[in-house]
Amino acid sequence: MPQANAIIVRIRSDKADEFERLFAEEELAIWDDLQSQGKLLKASMTRVAYGSEEQEGVQDYVIYAEFPGMAEHTAHDDDPRFKAFLRKARAFQPRSPWVW
């Protein structure tokens, strides 16, 4: 059975464009590699407009990723490129993301 997660990432609004560039340059390359190996079924990042948790000065994003199983998800999370991306992205976050 596929394994999926939805993550709500909160980014300071003044860093939203920089976060999107970083995501496009670093995380999308990882997704492309995993998809070409059959280790990622689908994934997306969407900028949220409006919502019950909207906060001034914060831009929310929904990141969805679906893997064939937990082993493939763990392979993504253990990828050194992802760990490097995550260190940079966390600097833009006023609080921890919500993960389901």
PLM features: what roles do these ranges have?
Residues 21, 53-57:
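Conserved, structured core segments of small domains
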Residues 8, 12, 80-81:
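Short, solvent-exposed aromatic-acidic interface loops
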Residues 15-20, 71-75:
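Short, conserved charged micro-motifs
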